[in-house]
Design a protein with these regions (language model features):
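N-terminal DNA-binding recognition helix of tyrosine site-specific recombinases/integrases
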Residues: 55, 83-115, 161-165, 226-228, ...
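Short, polar N-cap/turn motifs at the start of nucleic acid-interacting alpha helices
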Residues: 174-179, 273-293
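Short, basic (Lys/Arg/His-rich) helix/loop patches that form interaction surfaces
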Residues: 226-280, 284
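Conserved tyrosine-mediated DNA breakage-rejoining catalytic core shared by Y-recombinases
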Residues: 169-206
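Basic/aromatic-enriched alpha-helical hairpins
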Residues: 5-84, 99-106, 113-115
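C-terminal secondary-structure termini that scaffold catalytic or DNA-interacting sites
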Residues: 308-316
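Basic, Lys/Arg- and aromatic-enriched nucleic-acid-binding interface segment
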Residues: 91, 115-164, 168
Length: 316
């Protein structure tokens, strides 16, 4: 058992998962100060909920702080949960985070966290970009460095199914010319190798070659995604279900960084690709239940299914 000086044996045992995950690294320098950080306050109250901190770290790109608790970060947190855990678990995690934020609400920029994190134990519904809307987004010409970064990474994520954190790391060197496959090891699941066919229709190689761009924070990223969607006319009026309530708005208003992976999964599904294959390409392995949460549309029954129920043709 890894031990932290200043903690009792029982405390070391109680917080072992968090210690092993590196969340107690700053403890010994100043225990009192550490307990007043976001990580300290959350872990001290919920020692077994390292998963919540890991999700926030993936979203933000660094260890979460009070200052990181913005509207967009919390909305992406809810999106991530609803796509990767059961609705009942998402409700529990959100309630726990809400409790910690409520005790420290003067320290965070988000004033609407109670509403954002009020998740019911029911499934949510989100938007995706259709094949035509994907073409519109890909064709957009960025006007600033920030737009170039967001446009590039969103397109890579949308064309490969990679998480945002992985999309930023992918380059042309991840492509195999002989097999025309892109392969990489996800940051979230380092023991897995993901392989995806290179999308030649939308010029994926060009986006992969355009790397080393200056990153931006998640709030800015989502704002730019919505701006681009609005500029290219992705404005169909949509009604989605969030936290058990209907929300109606132009589609561009309902998009975020997560829309890229949803678009990848949903369009493949509508094209008839099996959930098992989509799961492999998204790094979910054999866990198709996780993949199902990224599917935002229903597809028609295969003609072979319909023919099965038809009477056999009699031969004359």
């Amino acid at each position: 058992m890894e031990e932290i000086r200043g903690l009792s044996y029982e405390q070391n045992k109680k917080y072992q998962f968090a210690i092993a995950s590196g969340y107690f690294d700053e403890w010994e320098a100043d225990p009192r100060k550490w307990k007043h950080t976001f990580i300290g306050a959350f872990i001290w109250k919920y020692p077994s909920r390292v998963k919540v901190l890991n999700i926030l770290t993936d979203i933000i790109g660094n260890s979460p702080t009070w200052e990181d608790m913005s509207d967009d970060v919390l909305r992406d947190f809810v999106d991530d949960l609803t796509e990767n855990v059961a609705p009942s678990s998402a409700k529990t995690y959100c309630a726990e985070l809400k409790s910690v934020l409520n005790e420290n609400k003067r320290r965070i920029p988000c004033t609407d966290f109670m509403k954002i994190l009020s998740v019911k134990g029911t499934a949510t519904q989100s938007v995706y970009l259709t094949a035509h809307e994907m073409e519109l987004f890909v064709a957009y010409k960025p006007r600033t460095n920030i737009e170039q970064y967001v446009h590039r990474n969103f397109c890579v994520s949308m064309l490969t199914g990679a998480r945002q954190v992985d999309a930023g790391r992918l380059t042309i060197s991840n492509c195999d010319i002989e097999t025309n496959m892109l392969s990489y090891v996800p940051q979230k699941t380092p023991g897995v190798i993901v392989r995806v066919p290179v999308d030649e229709r939308h010029g994926l190689r060009n986006f992969l070659a355009d790397s080393n761009l200056e990153p931006c924070c998640l709030d800015t990223y989502n704002d730019v995604v919505r701006k681009i969607c609005r500029c290219v006319g992705i404005d169909t009026i949509c009604t989605v279900v969030k936290a058990g309530k209907n929300e109606t708005a132009p589609k561009w208003k309902l998009t975020s960084s997560h829309t890229a992976r949803r678009s990848f999964a949903t369009n493949l599904y509508l094209a008839g690709v099996s959930l098992e294959d989509i799961a492999m390409m998204m790094g979910h392995g054999k866990n198709i239940e996780t993949t199902k949460r990224y599917i935002c549309a229903e597809r028609n029954l295969n003609p072979n299914v319909m023919s099965y129920f038809q009477p056999a043709q009699s031969q004359s």
